[in-house]
Regions:
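Divalent metal-coordination and catalytic microenvironments
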Residues: 35, 50, 59, 83, ...
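A cross-domain feature marking catalytic cores of carbohydrate-active enzymes
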Residues: 34-36, 61-63, 85-87, 125-127, ...
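His/Asp/Glu-enriched short active-site or ligand-binding loop at hydrolase and phosphoryl-transfer sites
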Residues: 115, 129-171, 202-213
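Active-site environment of divalent metal-dependent phosphoester hydrolases
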Residues: 39-42, 89-92, 129-133, 153, ...
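Active-site beta->alpha N-cap acidic-glycine motif
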Residues: 2-96, 100, 104-107, 111-114, ...
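Non-membrane alpha-helical structural segments and their capping/turn regions in soluble enzymes
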Residues: 98-103, 161, 185-188
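C-terminal domain-boundary segment and adjacent tail
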Residues: 15-26, 53-54, 67, 186-213
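A short acidic, amphipathic alpha-helical/loop segment
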Residues: 45-46, 71-75, 134-137, 190-194
Length: 213
């Protein structure tokens, strides 16, 4: 059984201690999240942009890229953002056994702990594909899956201006978790247009809250 990325409604019915789809619905709160980094070219530009606008975010990192770019992970933490687990090699999770899936998670757990001395970190599955067996395994271990409630579509072959216009015309609701990616420059181009408007509107750009102990 696989729960597809378009089924946020289904995951949203599960307890938040198992799956986080939205953040606290405080007035103006919007939770930024970025997958697939760190990237040596695009992540620094994105961090510069977030710093200029006093915005915070959660970065769901790939283990192999953590090993390749540790200084970027250190910068993410130093600038007040939070870390999440996005597997070690970003494989097609549904083709792996449960043990192989957990190995991907645990290997990246160990890497992340070296940077922020915390854990276990929230895990966002590659491509958002969640299996029932992984949900059950996480429930037994008291682990937390992080999903999203608003997809920026920044991985689609659309001009950033069009994607930014969509977000302005249909803005995220308070508490929404916005899915973006920092393995390309698209997210930074979108946010360069959105962050000034959101701040003018009184929105607060935040990282996801820490996992409850």
């Amino acid at each position: 059984v696989r729960i597809r990325p378009t089924r946020q409604q289904v995951l949203g019915l599960l307890p938040e201690r198992l799956v986080l789809v939205r953040g606290p619905r405080e007035p103006g709160a919007l939770y930024l999240s970025f997958d697939d980094g760190p990237h040596p070219e695009h992540t620094p530009r994105l961090l510069d942009l977030l710093a200029r606008h006093d915005a915070r975010a959660s970065f769901f990192l790939i283990g192999q890229r953590i090993e390749q770019h540790p200084a970027l992970v250190e910068r993410i933490v130093a600038e007040g953002h939070t870390l999440g687990n996005h597997s070690y090699s970003h494989p097609l999770f549904h083709r792996l056994s449960l043990r192989e899936q957990l190995d991907e998670v645990e290997r990246t757990d160990r890497l992340l702990a070296d940077f922020d001395r915390s854990g276990p970190h929230r895990f966002r599955p590659p491509r958002g594909v969640v299996s029932l067996r992984l949900l059950l395994a996480f429930a037994r271990r008291g682990r937390n899956l992080a999903y999203w409630s608003y997809d920026s579509l920044d991985y689609q072959p659309q001009p950033p201006d069009e994607l930014a216009a969509r977000l302005l015309q249909r803005p995220p609701a308070d508490g929404d978790v916005l899915l973006m990616h920092d393995d390309s420059d698209c997210a930074a181009q979108i946010l360069a247009q959105l962050l000034p408007a959101w701040h003018t509107a009184g929105r607060s750009l935040r990282a996801l809250p820490a996992v409850a102990a």
